[in-house]
């Protein structure tokens, strides 16, 4: 998108997007009918769409002109290197956004993997009513396809070495470009960064970015939260791998819950900044993968964010996890995969994912809803008092699974300090319950027992089981903290000891 002002206007377009103007539908024409473009439109596009190549990260871009081979040499095009082309999205103010230059600089700062870096500048055609820009997107896609085919004819260059990176509406431009490439082979890769939703959600594969448009298509979804049935970013999968950071609905640090306060302070611009933050997060996650090669974010295949939040999807066998961003493992699939991950609110965005499974025995008939914290001690670092939310009361004998994320690498986990954090008032209630228990029952059988803590580290795939440091006292009481260490005994023996 263009300036901060464009997002509220974008939402206004979303609200009206299914209406008609002067009796004409705003929905794009079907793929087959759009393929025939008049000579007048082609001539117009050739003057309005610019292809820029960047010699270095500080360069403002050198224009490559279709059918002018001399411009390839002037702009420093190296046919032996891959070509990465950035495609911007819809614009209201007609200005290119600052993230473009950040991505150019990040791509040019890869000494181990040098590439040609280009930009599809279609700002004059993107600077239109949204529905008009959608129609223009298909035409611009044709121009990009024409450029790539000309490059193959003009230089010893293969389309398989092309990587198109499209943001918002630009993601669909990239998809159209791939679909218009004629011949047996496809372009190498397309990355869709929060591909635009309005006028594309629910359409056929030929009318949007899809896995058919390149040998490998990956997509990052960061703002799929619906407003009146529409979302800024497309929700449906559009690639071989579709990544949904933090569920894809919204992003941490974008302060959506404080929107009304921001509007009171900053006016309508607060709305634009809040929504732009989540939509554009896809761009910054991708740039982050370039700037921090040693801190790549891993995502995991899962059915939905609720299951992922329970820690149920941290497996990597059979290709069930992959790296988000530029360094993704490229595996074209017959059936696409949806992957989830948690990120921080700012760069570097990487977190470390852990699944915890805790088995409780509650010997009080009434379900308990205590508050817990865990402190994790690793070989490198430790994390203190991480709050634990089970989401339901503790019943007689049940195992609870949940996800914990850490913003630093603690190394190999060695000790877990588990604490019942309830207040002194709760402790008094607990003591009262203990008092009214029939005298015939032993005190040690009248409480909450924590049997084992099982842990799986997503990033290392390591599995660990922790047992109480004091096997003679397994009871846990309010305000009490217990240490758990790696189990030295067989879990089956532990079960016998507890009975």
From Swiss-Prot:
Signal peptide stretch: 1-21
Key words, A-Z: Glycoprotein, HDL, Heparin-binding, Hydrolase, Lipid degradation, Lipid metabolism, Secreted, Signal
Essential for determining substrate specificity: annotated span: 254-277
Subcellular location per the Swiss-Prot or TrEMBL entry: Secreted
GO BP, sorted A to Z: lipid catabolic process
Gene3D superfamilies xref list: alpha/beta hydrolase, PLAT/LH2 domain
Residues covered by the PLAT domain: 352-486
Homology family: Belongs to the AB hydrolase superfamily. Lipase family.
GO cellular component: high-density lipoprotein particle
Species, as recorded: Oryctolagus cuniculus
Keyword Glycoprotein: yes
Enzyme class per UniProt: hydrolase
Protein name: Hepatic triacylglycerol lipase
Disulfide bridges in this chain: none
Recorded catalytic activity of this chain's protein: a triacylglycerol + H2O = a diacylglycerol + a fatty acid + H(+); a 1-acyl-sn-glycero-3-phosphocholine + H2O = sn-glycerol 3-phosphocholine + a fatty acid + H(+); a 1,2-diacyl-sn-glycero-3-phosphocholine + H2O = a 2-acyl-sn-glycero-3-phosphocholine + a fatty acid + H(+); 1,2,3-tri-(9Z-octadecenoyl)-glycerol + H2O = di-(9Z)-octadecenoylglycerol + (9Z)-octadecenoate + H(+)
Superkingdom of the organism of origin: Eukaryota
SUBUNIT field: Homodimer.
EC number of the protein: 3.1.1.3, 3.1.1.5, 3.1.1.32
Major location category of this protein: secreted
